């Protein structure tokens, strides 16, 4: 281990400029031991891109997700927060609905929402406003509702629930506060599940399967959870709620931050915006570069299931490891000029980022997030070519998420 360095993800410098803080830690000490402090447990921080990808994310069962992806343990044997064969089978329930052709089929709906949001912006007489509230927030939130099968009109409630759950997961809440929120959310999802069960009863279907999607049942992921089988059995009610929660918390904030960061970086250096307008073929490059340079999630945690070695150091059982996505995405061994935002960075290089993870816990919603960001840029450069950045709002309150509360822009 290198010479001890000071690092605290809760300090103002790290919160305000995570790229600089996490990059400096990687450069000085790619494997760092963070002692316990302020009621937080001790943990290790790994910032080396190759080791994170090979030894942790693709390294087999040693580094477990079962104790949660936050600093403090959140033990679960349900759904996505598991490992091994059951986890693979459970993921497949959702993955079957996110094939390339299935994701492509969502394009018209994404385009319709984007067009509606752009029209609403153009109707504002002042020609300026907060890009987050007008566009970056409602687009992924409404799409999440449609994909899950929840009422699209309720997207603001879903956003509020998502923000609250993320804060309570990654910060230091009062005991029982997480459960209090779930007591508001679970009855809502249970009602939607029961509505689908009633449709099956009305149609006389005793053994539903995937063929009933789009016929007896709406073709959405809540229905998919209801008719799918894992290890030759139906999903339990708790497992179905787990899928609903995964969509609620995973399908909004990260994509909002992706779209917000992307536009901010393009507008803060107007020559980038002009470059993209002149060459729209760089849209995919710009999306991947944004994911690399400004990862919506700065880091995740894993827990060691047994004694192991990492970065030539002995690691005890049940040790907490924070793998720094933000630090790895600035690794000069992988990315040329890693501290520069370049929309013409070659795609094969830019796509080496770890912002969606890798291995068995690779983000299932990554193709949808990419598509939403791509369509957003396509429409913005076409319909709002004179976009200008006026100001950047405050930082989101959850330290593991990198995003802002607003982006003041003008388009006249």
Residue map of PLM features:
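Cytochrome P450
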Residues: 1-412
């Amino acid at each position: 281990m290198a010479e001890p360095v000071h690092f605290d993800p809760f300090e103002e410098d790290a919160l305000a400029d995570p790229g600089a803080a996490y990059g400096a830690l990687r450069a000085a000490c790619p494997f760092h031991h963070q002692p316990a402090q302020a009621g937080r447990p001790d943990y290790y921080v790994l910032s080396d891109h190759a080791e994170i990808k090979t030894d942790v994310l693709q390294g087999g069962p040693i580094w477990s997700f079962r104790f949660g992806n936050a600093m403090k343990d959140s033990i679960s044997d349900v759904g996505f927060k598991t490992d091994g064969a059951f986890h693979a089978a459970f993921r497949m329930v959702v993955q079957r609905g996110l094939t390339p052709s299935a994701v492509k089929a969502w394009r018209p709906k994404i385009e319709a929402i984007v067009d509606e949001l752009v029209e609403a912006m153009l109707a504002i007489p002042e020609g300026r406003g907060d890009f987050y509230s007008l566009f970056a927030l409602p687009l992924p939130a409404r799409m999440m509702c449609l994909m899950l099968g929840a009422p699209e009109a309720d997207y603001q409630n879903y956003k509020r629930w998502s923000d609250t759950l993320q804060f309570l997961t990654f910060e230091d809440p009062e005991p029982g506060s997480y459960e209090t929120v779930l007591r508001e959310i679970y009855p809502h999802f249970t009602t939607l599940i029961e509505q689908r069960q009633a449709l099956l009863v009305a149609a006389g279907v005793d053994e539903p399967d995937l063929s009933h999607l789009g016929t007896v049942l709406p073709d959405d992921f809540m229905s998919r959870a209801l008719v799918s089988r894992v290890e030759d059995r139906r999903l339990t009610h708790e497992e179905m709620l787990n899928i609903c929660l995964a969509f609620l918390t995973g399908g909004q904030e990260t994509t909002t931050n992706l779209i917000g960061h992307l536009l901010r970086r393009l507008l803060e250096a107007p020559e980038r915006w002009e470059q993209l307008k002149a060459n729209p073929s760089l849209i995919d490059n710009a999306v991947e570069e944004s994911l690399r340079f400004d990862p919506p999630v700065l880091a995740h945690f894993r827990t060691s299931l047994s004694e192991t070695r990492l970065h030539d150091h002995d690691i005890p059982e049940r040790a907490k490891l924070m793998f720094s996505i933000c630090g790895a995405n600035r690794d000069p061994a992988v990315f040329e000029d890693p501290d520069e935002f370049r929309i013409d960075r070659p795609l094969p290089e830019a796509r080496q980022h770890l912002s969606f993870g890798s291995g068995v816990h690779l983000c299932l919603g990554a193709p949808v997030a990419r598509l939403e960001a791509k369509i957003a840029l396509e429409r913005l450069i076409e319909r709002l070519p004179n976009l200008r950045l006026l100001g950047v709002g405050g930082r989101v309150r959850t330290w593991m998420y990198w995003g802002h509360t607003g982006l003041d822009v003008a388009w006249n």
